[in-house]
Amino acid sequence: MASSPITSWEIDGETVADFIFLGSKITADGDCSHEIKRCLLLGRKVMTNLDSILKSRDITLPIKVHLVKVMVFPVVMYGCESWTIKKAECRRIYAFELWCWRRLLRVPWTARRSNQSLLKEISPGCSLEGLMLKLKLQYFGHLMRRADSFEKTLMLGKIEDRRRRG
């Protein structure tokens, strides 16, 4: 798991393949598909816990939509600022969002109802992927406004060091 000690930046440490940081699993290759799957499963669990509320006929549809946006989506989006979302993960996120809306409207997966008709009935405004992109851009803007920080230097690619020959 561990390799030779790190000697740059005067830090004594070792290189590991993966570690947990602020509740997120960070891997050496930067792959975060497992983290996205974990958050989607947590969101699915929250959605199933809301079943009794979502099946209630006393609560109107706009309130149910707002409940999903406020109670389910933040669980899924926790830490999404650091994710690298590929096409496969994008499809998973879109499928999860539509699963939430189908569950909200009590439409079975066997029903031949288009996704567009669901979205038209719900009218959610911004998609889950769009909300994630908004959070990423807000975080990027926050980093760029900082005066002198390691994160800003890293994002701009201005780490000065000697490059080996070759």
Label each residue range with its predicted role.
Residues 1-166:
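Short linear motifs embedded in intrinsically disordered, charge-biased segments
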